[in-house]
């Protein structure tokens, strides 16, 4: 082979691209990784400084059933620790704070409780109909894909409190608005993360743990192992498949050649690349139609854990339109040092507040923390970190790309479909924990096996492989109560009461008529 010639070119040095390259090397192949940034990690980004020791400004959370990322972390000796949830969480709504335990805030209004319960139960039930590997094949795919989550919430929610929390549920999980996302896509997204409880929970859920020392250790470990196969500051500008080898050009005028290419970047970033021949129509239209979510990740550091002294763990669920933050988690180091609270500015709020100065965002965040926690100590941080992922040229947003109405059924089937000698990875193409680091690993390794299958090195039946459960982070089932399984919806309850009232009235009228001899055989 000539210089800059490889078996496979992997475009994207995030977790997905690096895990793809790692598997190729482990299988005896010679890949190269081209990363546009001056660092590896993609949408994971760990910063080290004296104030924070280390801080994850990007993807950070892992939990039970995320077995692939846990396997790779273990290979590099990266330990996990549990996000603190020993004390009470806080639900802030209508200007008041309500401590609670568990993944979801309790509802004391019986109608609101029925509405909340029916919301989660209905989403999980609908998700059961959706195949993880092909959501467009769901029995009601066309109907659900034409509907936004806002329309679905309007259809199944009776109370304002349920609709309000449902909006936050979408904001938190996919950093977009209910009116922006397809119901089919969002229901699939929740389903492939294990359901409403698994995706939203800290304990036993997707946010249970973090990596001690930061999530970027995973990418850095793979990059060290790959050595000079990883090329930084190599933004790809063109891919030419017309020759015997695929030719990839970078903006710094380097040329790389290989038999196959794996694109391990968000679908929308394909628009930065010129393709020869042009992409097929559906693929070309898909990459124009899947925007990225919007989020600013914010860490506020304090002298001490004053919230724990008040009996709070640091998790806040904040339902107030003027509040910048929607959800927080404790971000204190596992040894108890560097007390901090992590908060997300989500979706519409991240776009609205992006024009503020950094100091103004910090001030507003500290003010809402002071109100929610009932402590003026929140007003006096010792340090602040933030990352607006919407300004990242080579991400375009975070956490993941989302599908607006109508896109999944028309274009979803080409998301992973190879184009000639081009194969597609990236967390968006995963079928388990898409949008998370776990999905990035699944997608990268699957794309590598697709390439090896094309090379004749393995059978097609070996492309998709399940992962053994992590023994270090076992998953526990979520147990529902009798009432959670059988409590009627508000609509069902009112219908039952209406029928019951009618029957009671009819019975009373019948008794009166019978007593007066107006009915025969009485």
UniProtKB/Swiss-Prot annotation:
Residues 514-522 are mitochondrial intermembrane. It is found in: Mitochondrion outer membrane. Signal peptide: none annotated. Its cofactor is FAD. Gene3D superfamilies: 3.90.660.10, 6.10.250.130, FAD/NAD(P)-binding domain, Guanine Nucleotide Dissociation Inhibitor, domain 1. Residues 1-492 are cytoplasmic. It comes from the Eukaryota. The modification S-8alpha-FAD cysteine is found at residue 398. One of its GO terms (cellular component) is mitochondrion. The chain crosses the membrane at residues 493-513. Its main location: mitochondrion. Inhibited by both clorgyline (selective MAOA inhibitor) and deprenyl (selective MAOB inhibitor). The record marks 157, 366, 383 as: Important for catalytic activity. Coiled coil: none annotated. Keywords: Catecholamine metabolism, FAD, Flavoprotein, Membrane, Mitochondrion, Mitochondrion outer membrane, Neurotransmitter degradation, Oxidoreductase, Transmembrane, Transmembrane helix. Monomer, homo- or heterodimer (containing two subunits of similar size). Each subunit contains a covalently bound flavin. Enzymatically active as monomer. There appears to be only one form of this enzyme in zebrafish, whereas in mammals two forms (MAOA and MAOB) exist. Belongs to the flavin monoamine oxidase family. Catalyzes the oxidative deamination of biogenic and xenobiotic amines and has important functions in the metabolism of neuroactive and vasoactive amines in the central nervous system and peripheral tissues. Preferentially oxidizes serotonin and tyramine. Also catalyzes the oxidative deamination of kynuramine to 3-(2-aminophenyl)-3-oxopropanal that can spontaneously condense to 4-hydroxyquinoline. This is Amine oxidase [flavin-containing]. It comes from Danio rerio. The gene is mao.
């Amino acid at each position: 082979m000539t210089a800059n010639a490889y078996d496979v070119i992997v475009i994207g040095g995030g977790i997905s691209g690096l895990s793809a390259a790692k598997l190729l090397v482990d299988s005896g192949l010679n890949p190269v990784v081209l990363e546009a940034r001056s660092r590896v990690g993609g949408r994971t980004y760990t910063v080290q400084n004296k104030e924070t020791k280390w801080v994850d400004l990007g993807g950070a959370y892992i939990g039970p059933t995320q077995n692939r990322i846990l396997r790779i972390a273990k290979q590099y000796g990266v330990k996990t620790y549990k996000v603190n949830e020993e004390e009470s969480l806080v639900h802030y709504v209508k200007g008041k704070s309500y401590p609670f335990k568990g993944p979801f805030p309790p509802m004391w209004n019986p109608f609101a409780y029925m509405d909340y319960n029916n919301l989660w139960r209905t989403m999980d039930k609908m998700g059961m109909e959706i195949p993880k590997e092909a959501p467009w094949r769901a029995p009601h795919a066309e109907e659900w894909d034409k509907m936004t989550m806002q329309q679905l919430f309007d259809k199944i929610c009776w109370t304002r409190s349920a609709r309000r929390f449902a909006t936050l549920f979408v904001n938190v999980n996919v950093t977009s608005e209910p009116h922006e996302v397809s119901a089919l896509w969002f229901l699939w997204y929740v389903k492939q993360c294990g359901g409403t409880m698994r995706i939203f929970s800290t304990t036993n859920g997707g946010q249970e743990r973090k990596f001690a020392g930061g999530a970027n250790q995973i990418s850095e470990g793979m990059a060290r192992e790959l050595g000079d196969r990883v090329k930084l500051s190599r933004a790809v500008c063109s891919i030419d498949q017309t020759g015997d080898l695929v030719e990839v050009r970078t903006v710094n005028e380097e040329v790389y050649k290989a038999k196959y290419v794996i694109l391990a970047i968000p679908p929308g970033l394909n628009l930065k690349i010129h393709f020869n021949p042009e992409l097929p129509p559906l693929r070309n239209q898909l990459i124009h139609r899947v925007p990225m979510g919007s989020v600013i990740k914010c860490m506020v550091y304090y002298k001490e854990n004053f919230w724990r002294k008040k009996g709070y763990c640091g998790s806040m669920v904040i339902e107030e339109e003027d509040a910048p933050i929607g959800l927080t988690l404790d971000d204190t180091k596992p040894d108890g040092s560097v007390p901090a609270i992590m908060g997300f500015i989500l979706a519409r709020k991240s776009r609205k507040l992006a024009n503020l100065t950094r100091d103004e965002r910090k001030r507003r965040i500290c003010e809402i923390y002071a109100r929610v926690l009932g402590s003026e100590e929140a007003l006096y941080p010792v340090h602040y970190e933030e990352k607006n992922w919407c300004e990242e040229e080579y991400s375009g947003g975070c956490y993941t790309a989302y599908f607006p109405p109508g896109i999944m059924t028309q274009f979803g089937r080409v998301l992973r479909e190879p184009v000639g000698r081009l194969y597609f990875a990236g967390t968006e193409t995963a079928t388990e924990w898409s949008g998370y680091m776990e999905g990035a690993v699944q997608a990268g390794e699957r794309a590598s096996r697709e390439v090896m299958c094309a090379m004749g090195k393995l059978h097609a039946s070996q492309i998709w492989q399940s992962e053994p459960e992590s023994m270090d982070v076992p998953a526990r089932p979520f147990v529902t109560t009798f009432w959670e399984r059988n409590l009627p919806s508000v609509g069902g309850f009112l219908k039952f009461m209406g029928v019951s009232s009618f029957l009671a009235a009819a019975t009373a009228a019948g008794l009166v008529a019978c007593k007066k001899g107006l009915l025969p055989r009485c």
